């Protein structure tokens, strides 16, 4: 019986070592691919026009008119629904920002490419400074996808085909984060997935909690 236990422990140990080795090699492969793709986006797939536009494109202040437009759209056309929608949109942004910045980034503690010693001299930083925060996940990608998915799901019939523009907008901001040199592609990809899940969750809760106040109700009744 002792030999049986020893054999079982041996098999379990070898299996665990195999899995650890597999995951380590997989991560090393992904990390290498991630860095190579980053260098292509940041260093090869460039254009002077993008060098000027994308640093501005990614700035939150650039999009204040868009946020104000959406708020006015809701307030003017759906006054009884405005407060609940605006508050939920703000909560969506707050959750996505805190999950990305306060949970994921400290836990993974991945250096930004512009702070990575192995990439010194290889990164084109198009911002005044790299920033002291960590890289994974991209809060820009998380926040913009969370907000865009929330808008997409709660205002889809109001916006019509324009709802797709919000997803493209979020993707372009995420891409800009790689282009300007502050995030890896995996950072923005995972941030986009995380933001999508958060936006879907808050939109679902909004519909369940304020079913009679859904922005789409005015149009679906016609």
Label each region the model flagged.
Residues 3-67, 100-131, 217-222:
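N-terminal transmembrane-helix/juxtamembrane module of multi-pass inner/ER membrane proteins
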Residues 43-47, 59-63, 80, 144, ...:
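Membrane-interface junctions
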Residues 49, 79-85, 157-164:
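Membrane-helix interface segments
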Residues 58-77, 140-143:
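Hydrophobic alpha-helical transmembrane segments
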Residues 64, 89-94, 98, 188, ...:
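Alpha-helical transmembrane spans of integral membrane proteins, capturing the lipid-embedded, hydrophobic core
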Residues 71-100:
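Interfacial segments of alpha-helical transmembrane regions
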Residues 89-105, 162-176:
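Small-polar-interrupted transmembrane alpha-helices in polytopic inner-membrane proteins
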Residues 124-222:
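Membrane-embedded catalytic cores of phosphoryl/pyrophosphoryl-handling enzymes
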């Amino acid at each position: 019986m002792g030999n049986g236990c020893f054999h079982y422990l041996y098999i379990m140990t070898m299996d665990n070592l195999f899995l650890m080795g597999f995951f380590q090699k997989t991560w090393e492969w992904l990390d290498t691919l991630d860095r190579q793709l980053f260098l292509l986006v940041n260093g090869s797939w460039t254009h002077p026009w993008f060098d000027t536009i994308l640093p501005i494109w990614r700035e939150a202040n650039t999009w204040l008119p868009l946020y104000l437009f959406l708020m006015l759209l809701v307030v003017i056309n759906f006054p009884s629904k405005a407060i609940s929608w605006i508050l939920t949109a703000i909560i969506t942004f707050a959750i996505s920002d805190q999950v990305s910045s306060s949970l994921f980034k400290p836990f993974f503690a991945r250096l930004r490419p512009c702070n990575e010693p192995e990439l010194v001299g290889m990164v084109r930083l198009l911002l005044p400074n790299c920033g002291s925060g960590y890289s994974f996940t991209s809060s820009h990608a998380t926040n913009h996808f969370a907000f865009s998915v929330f808008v997409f799901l709660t205002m889809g019939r109001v916006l019509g085909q324009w709802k797709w523009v919000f997803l493209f907008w979020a993707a372009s901001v995420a891409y800009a984060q790689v282009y300007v040199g502050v995030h890896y592609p995996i950072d923005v990809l995972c941030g986009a997935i995380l933001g999508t899940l958060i936006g879907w969750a808050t939109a679902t809760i909004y519909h369940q909690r304020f079913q009679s106040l859904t922005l789409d109700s005015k149009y679906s009744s016609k």
